[in-house]
Amino acid sequence: MKAPFTSLAGFRAVFETLPQVDAEAVEAATARNETLTKPKGALGRLEELAIWYAGWIGDGRPALERPQVAIFAGNHGIAARGVSAFPPEVTVQMVANYRAGGAAVNQLCHVAGASMTVTELELDRPTLDFTVSPAMTEDELVAALAAGWEAVDDESDLLVVGEMGIGNTTAAAAIAAALFGGTAAEWTGRGSGVAGSALEAKTRVVAEGLERHADALSDPLEVLRCLGGREIAAMAGAIARARVGRTPVILDGFICTSAAAVLHALTPSALDHAIAGHVSAEGAHPAALARIGKEPLLDLGMRLGEGTGAIVAINILRSAVACLSGMATFAEAGVSGG
């Protein structure tokens, strides 16, 4: 679907008339769940997940058949400041690895039965160093938001977004600090594996960016423009598109959460269609999830990004939906109810 906006004002307008969850589907799914051949509540959070999914899909007996994983790749000017354990050229190299099927995300998509798309966002033109100037112009931000919006398959019934971009945990830390408050040190973690003096330098870069753009940080989209990256903006655009289309979303790690947090700061209901697939080993992720009101499904010590933790959670949601829609009721099975 072509993005219905050509400016940041147009993107903001998207959130003025967001569709609501289908209350009739929620009621039907809840009623059906009460009649299934199990003690009430015996499937725990799986029951909540299935009813949540039913409401957004709009079907009291839903199916999960077309999950999409949308990966976005972008390069960051701040990567030249040595904030990552890997050089900037790794972004392009990893995109090639995705297309060749050799990355972890490819294997996990196969196991989860998910399609995978990769969108490259001007990899030959990194964003600017946000300690010197805004990372993006307004036009560049709008283009990245639109690229994310248009990458979503209208036929998908679940969306996971992931990212590749050397330096993007630095951008995510800056976004989180700007949106949530606190110091650069509270939000800056090891990312790709930096430690010691390298982590200290990364933290200084985040602090410098926050100071440089202090006058712009009361506006969530200005936070994204000044401190973010194209792939982070594209994830925000994709999540927004899913919200408008009532497509459920599973959020991934810290970088994905920073993108989602921008939307949450615009209006908290922007993330009603989203759940957190996991909590990552990036130190600030639990705090970021708490700030947007999301309880993670998994805690596996993962910190790869790229959508991987959320993809692992797809089969948890698939299991929940299968039980709601496939189990027999007490009446159908001829089993006496409790």
UniProtKB/Swiss-Prot annotation:
Protein name per its UniProtKB record: Nicotinate-nucleotide--dimethylbenzimidazole phosphoribosyltransferase
EC number: 2.4.2.21
Xref: CDD domains: DMB-PRT_CobT
Gene3D superfamilies, alphabetized: 1.10.1610.10, 3.40.50.10210
GO BP annotations listed: cobalamin biosynthetic process
Pathway as given in its UniProt record: Nucleoside biosynthesis; alpha-ribazole biosynthesis; alpha-ribazole from 5,6-dimethylbenzimidazole: step 1/2
Biological function: Catalyzes the synthesis of alpha-ribazole-5'-phosphate from nicotinate mononucleotide (NAMN) and 5,6-dimethylbenzimidazole (DMB).
Gene Ontology molecular function terms on file: nicotinate-nucleotide-dimethylbenzimidazole phosphoribosyltransferase activity
InterPro entries: Nict_dMeBzImd_PRibTrfase, Nict_dMeBzImd_PRibTrfase_bact, Nict_dMeBzImd_PRibTrfase_N, Nict_dMeBzImd_PRibTrfase_sf
Alphabetic keyword roster: Cobalamin biosynthesis, Glycosyltransferase, Transferase
Glycosyltransferase in keyword set: yes
Superkingdom field: Bacteria
N-terminal signal peptide: none
Upper lineage: Bacteria, Pseudomonadati, Pseudomonadota, Alphaproteobacteria, Rhodobacterales
PANTHER family reported for this sequence: NICOTINATE-NUCLEOTIDE--DIMETHYLBENZIMIDAZOLE PHOSPHORIBOSYLTRANSFERASE
Catalytic residues identified in the record: 306
